[in-house]
Amino acid sequence: MSCTRETGGAAPTRGQKILAATLRGSLSVLLKPAFLSRSPVALQRHWLAALSRTTLPARGVPRRRTVLGPVPVELTGNGHSGTVLYLHGGGYVSGAPVTHRALTSHLAKLADASVAVADYRLAPEHPFPAALDDAHRAYLALLEKGHAPERLAVAGDSAGGGLTLALLQRLRDEGQPLPACALMFSPWVDLTLAETPPTVPGEAMLNRQWLMFAAEAYAGNQRDSAGASPLLGNLDGLPPLLIQTGSDEILANDSERLAEALDGADCDARYQRYPGRWHVFQLHAGMLHDADLALAECRDFLHRHWR
């Protein structure tokens, strides 16, 4: 099989151009300085949570706290089409269900789905493979609760995108029932940073120094293991994948390399690149038209594969 490559997004209106420039500038000024290796992890977590309040969760989407096995989750939406296990980003050292409510609530509403956002353990307090173990336990708990795998999906952004891929590989290797499909937004799939550029024009959030810090905090000397860097693992026999990334982000190369690797794998995959968009721009759903279009693509992908 091969990985189908597509260009996402639509020609922006003048208003959308102004909005995009404003959002990009806000990220560069307010968020990027917090993602410095010398910033205390507690500050990074607090700052990310505070800035997430500037996003717009979908209206009328219920949420409640519950658990899947031993893993706390925030259950978003109560749709009946299927269930998504969502693994948030944050470099394995920050992020939480609250920081990703805009993305997860709009996804739940669009797809008529329930989205279970795992509040997995973070590094450096809980290094590799704690996050992967929690994702694994949460997925198995969904199966134990009677969720049919053909009505399940796994999704994640950034570190959570890499975690999504690593979880699929572990489930496949164990012979566990695989979900119907998976979504990955700007996935971080190679923690060795062997081919990560120093920077890219227009990068609004991340920098290589912080990625090095986060990779070391999470995986230490195991950064080249498939569980931490799933790009280096076996990609055969995985469920259908949808990968979305922006052109203006330092991790775009991870998605490009993943698409190339999937060309030679026994896996059906689609890779959508959104020109002029930044890292996990889908977090601006409800404001940015391209974010809404991207999540509509996710809805269609889920409905195509859920049975």
Ranges and model annotations:
Residues 26, 65, 69-74, 78-307:
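Alpha/beta-hydrolase superfamily serine-hydrolase fold, recognizing
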Residues 1-76, 307:
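A glycine/proline-hinged amphipathic helix-loop "lid/cap" segment
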